[in-house]
Amino acid sequence: MIELRCPWCRTVNRIPETRTGSPARCGRCSQPLATTLAPVSVTDATFDAIVTRASAPVLLDCWADWCGPCHALAPTIDDIARAHAGRLVVAKLDVDANPETASRFGVRSIPTLLLFKDGQLVDRLVGAQPRGAIEARLHPLITGVTAP
C-alpha cells in the first residue's frame, strides 16, 4: 500500500500499489489524488495547487521545447516519475509558456530541477544531470534519511 496525503484536506489515504497510475480520490473530501506514473504539467496558474499543496515531495523540471539538453533529460524524468509514484510528485514547467513561475524561483538556465518539500524550495540542480545525481538529491526528501 502507498500512503498519500490529500493536498486539500490533509487526510492520509491508502492506495494499493496495483492502482498506482489509476485515478484516485480522497476518501474524505473526494478531491483527486496524484497517483500518476507520468510527470504532471504545471502552469503559472496551477503551480500553487500542484506544488505548494502536494502531499509528497515535488521534483519540478523547468524546461523549454527548443532546449536539446531538456529533451535528453526527459526520459530520465519519466523514469523517476514511474519509479517513485506515490512517494514523489514529478512535474514539468515550460518556462517559455510560464515565465512568472520561472522568474519567481530564479530559473536562469535550463534544464533546472527544483526540489520542494512541504511547499518550500529545498534544493535545485542546474543542467542535464545523470539519474544517479538526481536520485541522490531526492533520496533524503523521499525517505527523510540523509545520505552518509
What name fits each language-model region?
Residues 6-9, 26-29:
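Short cysteine-rich clusters marking metal-coordination/redox-active sites
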Residues 13, 33, 74:
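Cys/His-rich microdomains that often coordinate metals
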Residues 15-25:
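Short linker/helix segments within small regulatory modules
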Residues 30-38:
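Short Cys/His-rich micro-motifs in 6-15 aa windows
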Residues 40-58:
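A short beta-strand-turn-helix
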Residues 55-58, 62-66, 109:
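Short pre-active-site segment immediately N-terminal to redox-active cysteine/selenocysteine motifs
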Residues 69-84:
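Typically the conserved alpha-helix immediately C-terminal to a functionally engaged Cys/Sec
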Residues 109, 114-147:
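Non-catalytic, surface beta->alpha helical segment in thiol-disulfide oxidoreductase systems
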